[in-house]
Amino acid sequence: MRSEGAAPRRAARYGALSLVLATLLGQVTESRGVMDNIQRFSSLPPYLPVSFHVLRAETAFFLKEANPDPLRNASLQSRVESFFIYKAQQPPVLNVSYGPYSAEKVIPLDLMLNPNFLGPTSKFPFDWRLKAYILQEKVYLSHPKVQVLFHIVGRDWDDHRDEKLPCLRVFAFRDSREVRGSCRLGGPLGLCVAQLEMLPGWFSPPAVVSGRRRPAERPEGSPVELYYAVQPGDERGDCTGGDTRKDNAIRPGKDGQEGRTSHLQKIGTISLYRAQDSNQLSELRLDGNVVIWLPSQPVKQGDIVTASVTIANNSTVDHFILRAKVKKGVNILTVQTSEPRQWDVRQEVGNGGKHTTTSVACQRLGPGARNRSSNLFSEVMQMNFEIASFSSLSGTQPITWQVEYPRKGATDIAVSEIFISQKDLVAIVPLAMDTELLNTAILTGKTVAMPVRVVSVEENSTLRDISELVECKATDENVIKVSDHCDYVFVNGKEIKGKMDSVVNFTYQHLSAPLHVTVWVPRLPLQIEVSDTELSQVKGWRVPIVASKRPTRDSEEEEEEEQKGRGCTLQFQHATVRVLTQFVSEGAGPWGQLSHLLSPDWQFDITHLVADFMKLESPHIATLQDSRVLVGREVGMTTIQVLSPLSDSILAEKTVTVLDDKVSVTDLAVQVVAGLSVTLHPISENNKATSAVAMAEELLRAPKKEAIISTWLQFSDGSVTPLDIYDSKDFSLTAISLDEAVVSIPQPLSPWWPTVVAEGEGQGPLLRVDMSIAEACQKSKRKSVLAVGIGHVGVKFGWDDADSSQTGEKDEEEIKNHASDRRQKIQDLERPGQDELYHGNFPGDREEGALSATTTTKSLLDNNVGKSGRRDGARLHSIPIDFTNFPAHVDLPKAKTRGTLEENGLMQTAHGLSDLEIGMYALLGVFCLAILVFLINCATFAFKYRHKQVPLEGQASMTHSHDWVWLGNEAELLENIGDLSPPQDEHTTIIDRGLGGCEENNHLLLNGGSQKPTQSQVHRPPGSGGRQTREPRQEPANSPTSKMKKVKFATFTIPPEESCPTVNSILSGEDDIKWVCQDLDVGAPKELRTYLEKFQDSV
C-alpha cells in the first residue's frame, strides 16, 4: 500500500500535537511520508455487500474455494460469489440486491447441461435427463431380440401435464451394418421400450482368413454397441422421422442445444451367443443326500411343471421315502423313474380336500450300483405337476417337501414355489425419480425421501406398474433405507456414511433387479468460518443498553460514567459467521476411495440448513443474530456450536474471544451505488459450479437520479467489516455534499441510509459521510462523530448503455487509460500542496471519540488489491468511464479535497475528542498562548529600545544602547577586569543580523559557579560618532531599585563580519545580581564608567 502525502506511522501518534505547536509558534514543517507496504486488512478484504439469492431452484448452495484468489473480492464496487445448482425443475435465476436496487440473471443452459440432457427448455422442463436400461445383455440366436427401456429422470411424477414427449431412435452397429428401433416416451413416469432384432449373420463368428483356423466362440460372446438419439415426433405423435444421425456422429457434438440432442448417445454393450443356455433351474436341498430341481421361469395355466429328484453321487442311502404336498389348483401327476435299472419307485397319492399329498418310495436296485459320471448328482425320478387353476393372474403355488429314511426318521420340511403368470415377463426395472440423494437429514433432522416405482416388461414390450407386488431390501441401511411398502427410499439422519451406487434390491416372483442410488453425506466435523474471532469494544461508540445489551463488566470509577452513563455502554465488534462442509461419498470399490460432490477444493455454505441448531456455549458473552452475525456482549471466551438435531453430539464448534481491549474506528470506506448489474461465468475447474460477479453502478446518468451509499469500517486491530451487519439503531449516517451544483443530499427517509441526488454533471470526491453514535447516547450537544468517509461521485447525463457497448470492445485498454487519467488528475490536485503534512491517526493511537479537525488521509488497499480495480477501490471492468468528458472541478474546497484523493478506499477518519483530550489540549493551548504573549511582549520591548544609544563623556553618541544582563556582583566585575582579549575557546553566537551602523555580537555564557574572569571588549567602528542618539531615561544613583536584582530582555543586532563591539560575560557570583551597561551612566560604578571612557578614548 502506497500513500503520498501521508505522515509516517511513527509520526502519526504526535501528529495533532505537532500541528498545534507548528501553528502557534509559527514554525513550518516540511514532511513527506510513505506508508510502509503492509497489508492493512488482516481479515477478509472489503467488497460490495450485496445479497445473492438463487430463485427457481429446489436445492442450491453458495460455495467457498479452498484457496481463493485474494483479488476476487477486493473492491468496494463489486462482489464475486460462486454457487452450485444441485436440483432444479426449470432454469434458475440469480438475484442480487442491495437496498432498493436489484438485478436478475437467468443461468444459461450451457453452464448447467449434463451429458444426458433431454432437449431444449422451450419444449421440455429444465432438469429432465434420460436413463436407459438394457433388458437383455445376453442375446441368443434362438431369440435374437433386444429390448431397451428409457426413463426420464428428474420428472415430477405427480405433475400430469400432457407434454409432447420426444421420440427415441435406437441403433446397433456391427460390421458396417446397423439395426434400428424406436419408441416414444409417455405415461406419468415418462417410459418407453425400444425393441431391436439382431441380424442372424451377427451371431456367426468373424470371417476366417484363408490359411488360419476358425476361432472358437468366445465365452463372453460377440460385442455389439447400442446408441440412441432424441428426435421430435410428428404432428400425430408418430416416430417416423428420417435419419437423425448427422455426419455419422457417434459421440455428442457441440452444435448447440437444438442440434446436440440429435447426435448419438451411447447406451451400452450387449453380447451375442449362438448356443442357448440350458434351462435355468432352482435348487432345493432337503438334506445332504436328496436335492430337488425346479424350473425358475414362470408358468402359465395348464402347463406341466417337472421336478427333478436327484441324489448325491457320494451318498450311501439305498432307501428313502419322498413326500410332497400341494394346494388346491395343482394336480400331482405320475412319477417317472430316470434309471429303472438303478431305482425302484412306488407312488401313493392322497386327497385331503384343500391339499393333495403324494408319497414316493425309492429303493436302490443292487448293492454296488453307483453312478460314476462326473456330475455331483444323479437323477432318481421326475415328478410332474399340472397347473390347473389359480386365483390371480400372477402368483405362486407352494410345494412342501420332506424326505424320510427307514430307522432314521424324517427331515425338516422344505418349501419350493412355482411362479404362475399369464404374461411372458422379461424383466422388472426399479425406477427412482433421481439417481442421487443428498443426505441433509444429518444437518436438519428432516427425512429426505425419493419416490420409487417398479415396472415389469413383457415379451411384447408391455409395461406394467407392479410397485405394490414387489419385495425390497437395502443392502446397507447405514447408507440408505427403503420403506416397508417399497414405494420410496430415504435417509433419516441416522446414517453414518455415503456411498456411490448403493444398492436396494427389488424382487418380483422369480425376477429381481437392483436400484443404484448415490448417497452424498456432509463431511464431519463441519467447518465454522468467523470473519473475526477476537471481538473488542469500540472506543467512542456507545449504544443504548437493552435486554440483549447489558453492560459488559464493572468499570473503573473514571470509566463508569462513560460506560454506563445515560443508559449506554460501549459497542462490541461484530463478525460474520457461516458454516461450511463438503458432501462426500465412498467409492464402490474395495478400497472405498472418497469422492466429492464437486471437488476437494470447494466447500458448501450450509448455514441456512443448520441455523436452527447453532448456539453459543455462553450466550452472555456473545450472541448470534440471524445465525450469521456474531455480537460480543461481555469479556470472556465462548464457543460457537452446531448441534446434531437427532442426538447430543456436536457437529462443529469454533472458539471466539471477547477481549477487554478497546479498538477505534480508523477508516470508513464509502461507495456510491446507483444501480446493480450481474454477470455469470463458468468455473473452468468444475463445470457444475458457476461464478457470479455483482457490480455497483456509480455513475448517475440522469438529473435527479438517486443513489445510496455502501460503507465499510476498519478498526485499529486491522479487521474490516461492512456497516450493514450492525444494528441500524446504534448509529446514524449523515451525508454532506461538497459541491451542491453536482450532487445534493435530500432529506433522508431513514437516518441510517442517506441518499444522493444528481444535480449537474461533474465527478470527483464530492460526498462526505459522517458516522455518529445513536442520539440516545450523545453525552452533550456536541455530536459524537465516530468516522468520516469521502465518496467519489460521477454524474454525466446522456451516458447510456449504448455508449457502454461501443467502448466494450476495448475493455482492457479503456480500464488502463481511465485509471491513468484519474491518477493524473489526482496528482494535479495534489501538486499545489505536496509539501504540506497531512496528519492522520494510526490505528491504536486514537482515543475514544477522538475527532481530528482536519480531513484525514485515506488508506488504500495494498498494491495487489489495486490491480483488480481502481485506486479508489471501485472496479472499472463493466463501466469504462472517460473522466476527461466531465466538467472540471477547480473550485472544490481544497482542505476537503486533499484528504480524498484516493476516492472510496478505506480512509483514516476523524473522531470526536474525549473529555480528557479536550482538557489536555486546552491546557496546551493556554500554555502556548502564554508563550506567544510573552514573546510578543519581548518583541515589543526590543523594538522600543532598538535605536536607543547611550551618550558617553567625550563622545557625541553611540549607535545602540547595550542592554546587557550581568549575572554577577559589582565586586567580582571590578576584580576580574584584566586582559581585554577573549579566550581562544570562546565563540560568538549570531542571534540577529542587521545592516548599517555599529552592530554588536553578544555571547552570554551562563556558568554560575565558574571562576573565569569577566572580559569585555568594546570597539567603536569608524564614523559611528556622527549618529544621532536618543536621550536616555535617567534614574537616580541612589534609587532603591538600583540594588535589586533585575532581568531585562532586549533585542540585539548583528554587525558585519569586520570588527565590532563584543561583550563576553561570565557569571561569577550569585549574590547581588546587577544591571550592567544599561545606560553606562546610570546604575554603574564610577570606576567602570571611567574605565570605559578611557577605553573609548584610546580607540
Curated annotation (Swiss-Prot):
- Where composition is biased (Basic and acidic residues), the residues are 813-849
Q: Which residues lie on this side of the membrane: Cytoplasmic?
A: 937-1099
Signal sequence extent: 1-31
UniProt keyword list: Glycoprotein, Membrane, Signal, Transmembrane, Transmembrane helix
Disulfide pairings = none
Compartment(s) of residence: Membrane
> What InterPro entries would the database entry show?
Ig_TMEM132_2nd, Ig_TMEM132_5th, Ig_TMEM132_6th, TMEM132, TMEM132_3rd, TMEM132_C, TMEM132_M, TMEM132_N
UniProt entry tagged with the keyword Cytoplasm: no
Start and end residues of each stretch annotated as Disordered? 237-260, 801-872, 1002-1045
Top-level taxon: Eukaryota
Query: What parts of the sequence cross the membrane?
Result: 916-936
Gene Ontology BP annotations:
negative regulation of phosphatase activity
Q: Which residues lie on this side of the membrane: Extracellular?
A: 32-915
- Indicate where this protein is primarily found: membrane
Where in the sequence does glycosylation occur per the annotation? Answer: N95, N314, N371
Q: How does it sit in the membrane?
A: Single-pass type I membrane protein
The residue ranges flagged as biased composition, category Polar residues, are 1008-1018
GO CC list: membrane
Concerning its family, UniProt says: Belongs to the TMEM132 family.
Report what the protein is called.
Answer: Transmembrane protein 132C
Lineage start: Eukaryota, Metazoa, Chordata, Craniata, Vertebrata
The protein's gene is named Tmem132c
